[in-house]
Amino acid sequence: MQAPTKVATRTAIAASGAPVTILAFAGDIASTSKEPILEAYGATDAQKLLLDFSGTEYVNSSGIAIIIQLLLDATRNGGRTVGIFGLTPHFQKVFTMVGIGKYATLSPDEATALRLL
């Protein structure tokens, strides 16, 4: 049974001194995650955005499609810089294989992600 997706929003400061909005996901990322993820994303106008997957154990193909939709909107339409951190080793490989690294920097942890933004 899938754990419902929750998204918490917080602010941090990048190494450059710029404000960063962090969307921290908890639960599984699947088709039912679209509304909470895109709603949280739509509520921020930050130019630097981090997606925190440290509270996520499972992401299915529908979940990956939602993340790609968010990334395409953020980078192409919004001109935003996006980073991702907290992926399990398995999903680090999956995200790399499907090309998410073209749209977001993949980092092992928050400190590294903030340094790279």
Give the location of each predicted region:
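Amphipathic alpha-helical interaction surfaces in cytosolic regulatory modules
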Residues: S31-A104
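STAS-typified acidic loop motif
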Residues: Q2-E39, F53-G55
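Short acidic-hydrophobic, aromatic-tinged amphipathic segments that line or gate anion-handling sites
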Residues: T105-D109
